[in-house]
A protein has these predicted regions:
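Domain-level signal for soluble alpha/beta catalytic cores
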Residues: 1-263
């Protein structure tokens, strides 16, 4: 039996892609048709390079997304303003290092609006473009197996915080209902779905630092319940989950043990 090679999803973008993404992010004028052409060409190139490198299960590199989680604000209603920013607990333990990171500007500043209204889909038009670009590139370069990323309800709630729903649980439920169609659309397109769930580990030392590990695990369980609701009816073999403790440069001395968050 051979092992298949794959990766987590997000891959480096070329400068033209970056310029378009941040023009859109900042609300600047840009040519939508040129944007779409740029994304199509960039996805083709990123798939070519994956195939050349021997990757068996390829992705679009999340090329058209400003971020693996906050892209949701552009495709769903209810988000405006700005969410509170909170540095991970391990970086707060080393304030000089945190200050140096901030001054280096190594992490781009993405908009992180709060949920201030009902979360509903604006339609799957942008997702359909992503799917079409990936499948066209796969056909061109002979890749037979592909996957596409989508944010989990929990990670959305981590970065786009709740200012509308009466409880955190109600917000998670609304996000799960809203994301169901996105998940289903990816699977029905013949791609595997990767649900990005850093909330199941990263949020322990980012948002829930006031809780004990045991209390956090209960929060994580509620996130899993919301995710399972959103995935209901999809074949298990077509879904994979990405959990991480954050890919930022830091000491990571506050990461919760894997044994506590994985069954």
């Amino acid at each position: 039996m051979s092992l298949l090679a794959t990766h987590v999803g997000s891959l480096p973008r070329g400068q033209a892609v970056v310029d378009f993404l941040f023009a859109r992010e900042r609300g600047e004028d840009y040519d939508p048709e040129a944007f779409d052409r740029c994304m199509t060409e960039a996805v083709s190139e990123v798939v070519r390079r994956q195939v050349e490198a021997g990757i068996d299960v390829v992705s679009d590199g999340e090329t058209s997304k400003i971020s693996y989680a906050t892209y949701v604000k552009d495709r769903y209603t209810g988000f405006e303003g700005d969410s509170p920013r909170n540095a991970p607990a391990d970086l707060k333990m080393f304030p000089t290092f945190l200050d140096r990171l901030a001054k280096q500007g190594g992490t781009p500043q993405y908009a992180r609006p709060m949920c201030m209204g009902e979360v509903t889909s604006k339609g799957q038009g942008e997702l359909q473009k992503d799917i079409a670009n990936l499948k066209a590139a796969m056909a061109t370069y002979g890749a037979s197996h592909g996957f596409m990323n989508a944010a989990s309800p929990g990670v959305i709630s981590l970065f786009l915080q709740n200012g509308f729903y009466p409880t955190r649980e109600a917000y998670l439920a609304a996000l799960a209902d809203a994301m169901r169609d996105e998940y289903r659309t990816i699977v029905e397109a013949g791609l595997d779905l990767q649900v990005d769930c850093p909330d199941l580990a990263l949020s322990r030392h980012m948002l829930f630092t006031h809780l004990s590990d045991e209390e956090f695990v209960k929060v994580a369980e509620s996130h899993v319940e919301a995710l399972n609701h959103a995935l209901d009816g999809l074949p298990e073999e077509r879904v994979r989950v990405h959990i991480c403790w954050g890919n930022y440069e830091g000491p990571h001395v506050c990461d919760i043990d894997m044994a506590k968050v994985l069954p």
